Regions:
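N-terminal, positively charged regions that mediate nucleic acid binding
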Residues: 1-40, 155, 407, 413
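Glycine-rich, mobile lid/loop segments that gate access to catalytic sites or pores
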Residues: 6, 48, 66, 73-243, ...
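A short glycine-rich, hydrophobically flanked beta-strand micro-motif that places a catalytic Asp/Glu
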Residues: 37-41, 165-171, 231-235, 301-312
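Glycine-rich anion/phosphate-binding loop at the beta-strand->alpha-helix junction
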Residues: 196-297
Length: 417
């Protein structure tokens, strides 16, 4: 029976995403100057104010206030009328040293015995629905806002955009779980003042449909036919959206965990990513399970896969690993048997995850908006400046968990040709 499925995304200027980006910028700076830093950093943003709190064990000394301001500046909060502006907002830091009780559970005599930073379960998901092995509704929702931010920065075709925005996409699926139609698209974008509300609504709706949508449609050759005139558009459905960002809503780190992952597909263990160094398995194991799921799909093992792993705090070996193929497996094995082979291919102890995915590098700022999954692996150079003027330039590989570097190993292990 056909059904509808919906996913949402939020822009880099959304209050919760500002908080995520500040927390991850701090992670990157700590790791740039001390790769063994242990960090758990939370951020709160509100009208004219940023509050930083968390636990750190590191040899690095940072100007956390300037790091926070730099993030805010890059996002685009550079005007006093936003009531949250990079140069003038207050930045309060309550960051302190990590608990020795927690640290003793992570640090061991040998690196291989490094324990999980906490208990919990983590999930990784992949589907052959899109080229990047992500659910289509979420993929479109992200790209709507990526392109909207690009239009804002270009400041040519659309000149009234402000940083805060949200999107939502509803797809219709057929009896075979294949997307056949875009039912509805919701876009809410912060904007400058207009002369009148009717003029504002008319202009924004026209620009979204005639400028934004074609840019997004061009990225989906396979699904271009889904972008038709039957789509229901809800553009700024509440009307005026001048007051936004942290002045409109308080933002906190870790409140957009479904946007960060699979848009409601698969499952989520509940642990947020941003502000956590890779010793926290909430983050590292979620990346590792995505890496597994994506390589299983790319190898042709199944059409859809959910991988679960769980840990006990201070224990290196996972307490469980489970693979769910939703009945789409192409090999004549039970999901239980598939799970056992996956466990042999991928070492899921925290230290080995860190090494395999190169997670002790400053690679996290780029993850903090528009999804941690489904992104393109790439090598870039990043430069960091310490308060004493020390400059560090590092060549790092982003989104290593998106690499298809285990496809051959998976095919060999499962006898897939």
């Amino acid at each position: 029976m056909p059904y509808l499925f919906t996913s949402e995304s939020v822009s880099e200027g959304h209050p919760d995403k500002i908080a995520d980006q500040i927390s991850d910028a701090l992670i990157d700076n700590f790791l740039a100057f001390d790769a063994q830093s242990k960090v758990a950093c939370e951020t709160l943003v509100t009208t004219g104010q940023v509050v930083l709190a968390g636990e750190v064990k590191s040899k690095a000394y940072l100007d956390v206030q300037e790091i926070a301001r730099d993030v805010i500046r890059k996002i685009g909060y550079t005007k006093s009328e936003y009531m949250f502006e990079a140069s003038s907002c207050g930045v309060l830091s309550a960051i302190h040293e990590q608990s020795a009780d927690i640290n003793q559970g992570v640090d061991r005599k040998t690196k291989e015995e490094q324990g999980a930073g906490d208990q919990g379960m983590m999930f990784g998901y992949a589907t052959n629905e899109t080229a990047d092995f992500m659910p289509l509704a979420l993929d479109i929702a992200h790209k709507l806002l990526i392109e909207l931010a690009a239009l804002r920065r270009e400041n040519k075709q659309i000149k009234y955009l402000r940083p805060d925005a949200k999107s939502q996409v509803t797809l219709e699926y057929d009896d075979h779980n294949k997307p056949v139609r875009i039912d509805a698209i919701v876009v809410s974008t912060q904007h400058d003042e207009f002369d009148s509300e009717p003029k504002m609504l008319s202009k924004i709706k026209s620009d979204v449909i005639n400028i934004l949508i074609p840019r997004v449609k061009a990225k989906y050759k396979k699904y271009a036919k889904l972008f038709n005139e039957e789509i229901k558009y809800h553009i700024n459905p509440t009307g005026k959206f001048v007051i936004g960002g942290p002045h409109g809503d308080t933002g906190l780190t870790g409140r957009k965990i479904i946007v960060d992952t699979y848009g409601g597909r698969g499952a989520h263990g509940g642990g947020a990513f941003s502000g956590k160094d890779p010793s926290k398995v909430d983050r590292s194991a979620a990346y590792a399970t995505r890496h597994i799921a994506k390589n299983l799909i790319a190898a042709g093992l199944a059409e859809e896969v959910l991988v679960q792993v769980s840990y006990a705090i201070g224990v290196a070996q996972p307490t469980s690993i489970n693979v769910n193929t939703y009945g789409t497996a192409k090999v004549k094995m039970s999901d239980g048997d598939i799970s056992k082979i996956v466990e042999q291919i991928f070492d899921m102890r925290p230290y080995f995850i860190e090494q395999r995915l190169k997670l002790r590098n400053p690679i996290y700022s780029e993850t903090a908006a528009y999804g941690h999954m489904g992104r393109q692996p790439q090598i870039i150079e990043k430069t960091f400046l310490s308060p004493d003027g020390k400059k560090v330039t590092k060549k790092v590989e982003l989104f290593t968990w998106e690499k298809l570097d285990y496809v051959d190993k998976v095919r060999k292990a499962f006898g897939i040709k």
